[in-house]
């Protein structure tokens, strides 16, 4: 079998919340200013905050969100990468959860629909958010169009100019993208005055988006890191679990990339549910990231700000520092300085391990994958591919099954690939 599909009437109708199953209680956020929690309550939709701290293990997905999931391409298929299996020696079964098949081209639409829906239900004038490479921004733009909401997207400055096609996508959906830091907010103007040549960062863009929402009657929505965002995205993992069971397959390894953590967590957490409940971890969980932003392999597990402007409460997570300005690598979605608290806790407990790969290694595998499987991965997604070679080499003489979160396609990133790989 090459492709495993779910029919729309077989799609899961619940998200998964990992909080009740964590091996220990998640460290509580800290507010050192006395203002961060109030800011959070004003900026974020109340229903999103309710999910953020909920103890309900399997909350039901609202019907209107389920309908929109189906409208934008859910359920997504699982594809078996048989040619890549042959290239790696034939001892692996490699299954790809194809989140690139959604209308926005990535996994980001899974939570964007929920965030925008809850903002609309609360009567917000608009939504504002940050985006790195533009996958989240284009997903929010699409979700806002479907729910008839205005959206303002603060896109990391280097990506705003280096990745114009996702910006154009946002315009097509009726959104308002802005380079961050921008002249559009007081905070952005202050940053530009201090650092006129800054490439920007996701931390900066988060602060701008929050300030804009607070100052203009909108609601801020986060594209990763927070528990509620991961919960909304677990529709992917819930589908994948059902698909693998239908096919009679049980993954030994679950692999995916981490920018802030929601992509990998959304696939891995539903599989971890039974293992955490039983206290016995039987699969191997590996998350990969960018060596240029080595938060997982060189970061510290400590309290840090999720945004550069120190607007939000401190979270305990793996971090290389809220004020870290990452280099202008093409995998813009991996440039965030920290890892989601839930995923960080699992990493700290040794349940999830981490790898970081530099752009050259990741893009080498992006090209190999494109030539063997005929599908071009997003630059971010390509950072998961070197893990497959490691797994194949480690298990010579043994058959292993690997499930990969194929988080997005690279069709809008061909200009970046052309520069990095020196195409004519």
Swiss-Prot record:
Alphabetical list of InterPro entries matching this protein: Trp_synth_b-like (IPR006316), Trp_synth_b_CS (IPR006653), Trp_synth_beta/beta-like (IPR023026), TrpB-like_PALP (IPR001926), TrpB-like_PALP_sf (IPR036052)
Molecular-function GO terms, alphabetical: L-serine hydro-lyase (adding indole, L-tryptophan-forming) activity; pyridoxal phosphate binding; tryptophan synthase activity
Reported cofactor(s): pyridoxal 5'-phosphate
Gene: trpB
Listed PROSITE patterns: TRP_SYNTHASE_BETA
Described purpose of this protein according to its UniProt entry: The beta subunit is responsible for the synthesis of L-tryptophan from indole and L-serine.
Lineage of the organism: Archaea, Methanobacteriati, Thermoplasmatota, Thermoplasmata, Thermoplasmatales
HAMAP family in the cross-refs: Trp_synth_beta
Family: Belongs to the TrpB family.
Subunit-structure text: Tetramer of two alpha and two beta chains.
Protein name stated in the entry: Tryptophan synthase beta chain
Pathway: Amino-acid biosynthesis; L-tryptophan biosynthesis; L-tryptophan from chorismate: step 5/5
Modified residues (N6-(pyridoxal phosphate)lysine): 108
């Amino acid at each position: 079998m090459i492709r495993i599909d779910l029919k729309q009437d077989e799609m899961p109708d619940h998200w998964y919340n990992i909080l009740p199953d964590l091996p220990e209680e998640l460290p509580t956020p800290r507010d050192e200013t006395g203002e961060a929690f109030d800011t959070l309550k004003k900026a974020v939709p109340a229903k999103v905050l309710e999910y953020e701290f909920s103890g309900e293990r399997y909350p039901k997905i609202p019907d209107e969100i389920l309908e929109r999931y189906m409208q934008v391409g859910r359920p997504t298929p699982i594809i078996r990468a048989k040619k890549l299996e042959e290239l790696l020696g034939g001892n692996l079964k490699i299954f790809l959860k194809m989140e690139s098949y959604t209308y926005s081209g990535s996994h980001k639409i899974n939570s964007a629909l929920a965030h925008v829906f809850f903002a609309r239900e609360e009567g917000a004038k608009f939504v504002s958010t940050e985006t790195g490479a533009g996958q989240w921004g284009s997903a929010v733009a699409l979700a806002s169009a479907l729910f008839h909401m205005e959206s303002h997207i603060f896109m990391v400055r280097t990506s705003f100019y280096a990745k114009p096609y996702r910006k154009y996508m946002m315009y097509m959906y009726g959104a308002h993208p802005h380079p961050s830091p921008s002249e559009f907010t007081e905070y952005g103007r202050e940053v530009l005055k201090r650092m006129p040549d800054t490439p920007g960062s996701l931390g900066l863009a988060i602060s701008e988006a929050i300030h804009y929402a607070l100052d203009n009657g909108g609601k801020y929505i986060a594209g990763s890191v927070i528990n509620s965002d991961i919960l909304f995205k677990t529709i992917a993992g819930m589908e994948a679990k059902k698909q693998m069971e239908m096919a009679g397959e049980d993954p030994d390894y679950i692999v995916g990339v981490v920018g802030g953590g929601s992509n990998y967590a959304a696939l891995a957490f539903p599989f971890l549910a039974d293992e955490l409940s039983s206290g016995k971890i039987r699969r191997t969980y590996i998350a990969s990231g960018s060596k240029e932003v080595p938060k997982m392999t060189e970061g510290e597990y400590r309290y840090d700000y999720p945004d550069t402007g120190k607007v939000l409460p401190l979270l305990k997570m793996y971090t290389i520092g809220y004020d870290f300005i990452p280099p202008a690598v093409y995998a813009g979605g991996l440039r965030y300085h920290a890892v989601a608290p839930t995923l960080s806790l699992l990493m700290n407990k040794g349940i999830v391990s981490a790898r970081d790969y530099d752009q050259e290694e990741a893009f080498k595998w992006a090209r190999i994958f494109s030539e063997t499987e005929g599908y071009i991965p997003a630059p971010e997604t390509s950072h998961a591919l070197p893990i497959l070679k490691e797994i194949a080499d480690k298990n010579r003489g043994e058959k292993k099954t690997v499930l990969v979160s194929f988080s997005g396609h690279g069709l809008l990133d061909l200009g970046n690939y052309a520069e990095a790989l020196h195409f004519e």
